[in-house]
Every structure is written in structure tokens, then in C-alpha cells.
């Protein structure tokens, strides 16, 4: 498990997440989407593949199919979810 900071422009907020770095990034995106939907009391988006997760540290788009670890994400990484 890693602790990562994720900025969500849609709600203009930063959140700290404890994430499993060994699961596919798309699974992490599902978890983020679910948490944000509960926070803003909206329905969770149906098409998670319409969203992307960027690394703020490297400026790269994360591959949905690779794990966070394989995408170079580690403890303390900063990401943007759009």
C-alpha cells in the first residue's frame, strides 16, 4: 500500500489515498470515482474509461492496464484525476 495525493479538478480538491500499487490503474480509478461520487452526492460515472489519471511528478498519462507500480507511482506520488 502507498499513500498518494490525488487532485480532482472537477471538485477543486486534493485527497490523500491509501492505494494498492499492485492492482491495475483502472481499478484504482474506479475507487477514486466512487469516493468522489459519495463525497459530492452524485451518481458514479458509468464509463470510467472516459477518465484519465496523470502523474504530476512525471507529467505522464498512466496506462489503465498497468499497475500503479508499473506506471512509476510510489509512496508520496502526486496525481490528477480528470
Report residues per predicted region.
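Ubiquitin system architectures
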Residues: 1-82
Amino acid at each position: 500500500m502507498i499513500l498518494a495525493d490525488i487532485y480532482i479538478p472537477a471538485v477543486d480538491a486534493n485527497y490523500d489515498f491509501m492505494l494498492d500499487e499492485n492492482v491495475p490503474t483502472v481499478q484504482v480509478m474506479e475507487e477514486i470515482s466512487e469516493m468522489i461520487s459519495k463525497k459530492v452526492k452524485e451518481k458514479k460515472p458509468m464509463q470510467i474509461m472516459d477518465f484519465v489519471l496523470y502523474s504530476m511528478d512525471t507529467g505522464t498519462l498512466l496506462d489503465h492496464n498497468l499497475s500503479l507500480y508499473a506506471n512509476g507511482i510510489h509512496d508520496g506520488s502526486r496525481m490528477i484525476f480528470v
